[in-house]
Amino acid sequence: MAYNITSLMTNFCLITTILSLTLSFKQNSDNNKITKYMRNAFIISLLPLIIYIDQQMDSSSSFTSTFNMISFNLLLGFEADMYCLTFFSIALYITWSIMQFSLWYMHEHNNTLFFKYLTMFLISMLFFLSANNLLQLILGWEGMGIMSFLLINWWHNRLEANSAAMQAIIYNRIGDTGLIIFMIWSALFTNSWNMKQIFILQNNSMDLWLPLLGIVLAATGKSAQFMLHPWLLSAMEGPTPVSALLHSSTMVVSGVFLLIRFYPMIKNSQMIISIILCLGAMTTLFAALCASSQTDIKKIIAFSTTSQLGLMTVTIGINQPQLAFLHMSTHAFFKALLFLCSASIIHTINNEQDIRKMGSLHLILPFTSSCTLISSLALMGMPYLSGFYSKDIILETLNMSYVNAWALLSTMLATALTSIYSTRLILLSMAMTPNINTLIFLKKDKNLFSPLIRLTLGSIIFGFIISTFFLPEKQPNFSIPFNSKILPTIMLILVSSLTLYFMNNHKFSHMPPLFFPSMSGYFPAIFHRLFSYYFLLFPKKVSSSLLDILWYETLGPKSISHNLSSSSSLFNKLSQGTINNYITIFVITILSSLLTSALYF
């Protein structure tokens, strides 16, 4: 009875939360009202979270059968477990902060459509988080893809924004084929799209590599893993609040969340586990290398997102999905804070994004600089900020796990590079000699400072809260020597100190124009230029070299001209009056007549 009441209250609160967000689409809603609706939805979402903390009981509900076939029933419902309830509140909290910040940032474009797009983006994520079946899951999944296209292309009169939005759609369509493959497999072999039923019905005798490879492909596209990552960098063409929401708590983390959701199946395939581990290791190292050589503040933060997503994928690859979710939750706060701080900085220095042209911002923007410092330290894993509670335990578990040395070394090197590019960002933008030309002094506005304060508090204390109340179900082994336990912290301090020393005491030469990390690993040049060139060149050659020649030479006017020329040449020879032609015609005629007479008479 207690379970039924708890389940009823939990699902009622989840439905109420989503329905309260739909008030944003009323015709008389302005931007302030939409932001208040988001705040109210966050407050309502805390109730099921408190119920879960008290009861420690998952809740799964299904409603009336939507599709009824001979052997296939589909029940729509909600999956209210630790993952759903925790990230539900996190996503609402961060979106509320981003929307309030947008009241200041987008004040020159007072358009409620932007806020409604953000609300729809969040509703798609919440629908995805709470889905207990594949139909709801793919509706939320595709909803995020559509809304990301609209938001990235918000400045639709800019060619770069159009191109970035198309990249996001195309790369995600590649990943979406994997999810469709899994849906087809589950319908054929388990006769169900309910995720819990699929987990129960699948057994070790099934060949799971193809459907699980589809899940990995879907996560690779959505979470911008190696090979399908270029769209995330291009997505910086959208407004900075969109980047903050996209990178922190919605679209890009949905791929990692998909792997966490399907871990009960993934753990049965060692091959898929190894693929996930190596994919995450390549992603985190590659993105960290690229971030270390970028000069655009938004691109540095974007590559840092890709690197952290790779770290989450590595964590799933060492069979610790709870730790991956812990890092996903803490990462949401300081990544949203980093983007909002960068938006404030860019707006102040007249839309300049090159960190080499900044400097001494702590004198001009002391509060924003403090928030940037805290978020960067949390990203590095500084004790005792939010990032420390997730990154430290991940690195400890990675050191104690039986993984191949290449994946371990790549992840450790990426962690060191995180300290390098974060320290470089702090120094060049805040502590070096000022190189700023134009300043736009900020007025004191609660819509600017309140979101930064809330996200800063989250970046400081949320890691402690979630690690206290939501301990992993699968506890890693912590019986390691003290020296090994403090190794990540020592490495963080050492690498940051070395970066400080070299940047202050050595003059670095300009990077080569075709330097691998600064060119994003040549991916834009190869995939967007070279492949497109040859892909378009092939049909051009087919049309010009094959079809045109076939028509022109064999069937077309040139062929007709050749045939007429041959015929006229023959008749011309016959009409020249030579005795040889007449004798030949005479002989042929006589022989034909004799042959005909012999055959018929």
From Swiss-Prot:
GO terms for cellular component: mitochondrial inner membrane. GO terms for molecular function: NADH dehydrogenase (ubiquinone) activity. Signal peptide: none annotated. One of its GO terms (biological process) is ATP synthesis coupled electron transport. It is a multi-pass membrane protein. It comes from the Eukaryota. It catalyses: a ubiquinone + NADH + 5 H(+)(in) = a ubiquinol + NAD(+) + 4 H(+)(out). Pfam families: NADH5_C, Proton_antipo_M, Proton_antipo_N. InterPro entries: NADH_DH_su5_C, ND/Mrp_TM, NU5C-like, Proton_antipo_N. The keyword Metal-binding does not apply. Its EC number is 7.1.1.2. It is found in: Mitochondrion inner membrane. The chain crosses the membrane at residues 5-25, 37-54, 83-105, 112-129, 134-156, 169-189, 209-231, 240-260, 271-291, 300-320, 323-343, 363-383, 400-420, 451-471, 478-498, 508-528, 581-601. The keyword NAD applies. Keywords: Electron transport, Membrane, Mitochondrion, Mitochondrion inner membrane, NAD, Respiratory chain, Translocase, Transmembrane, Transmembrane helix, Transport, Ubiquinone. Belongs to the complex I subunit 5 family. Core subunit of the mitochondrial membrane respiratory chain NADH dehydrogenase (Complex I) that is believed to belong to the minimal assembly required for catalysis. Complex I functions in the transfer of electrons from NADH to the respiratory chain. The immediate electron acceptor for the enzyme is believed to be ubiquinone. This is NADH-ubiquinone oxidoreductase chain 5.
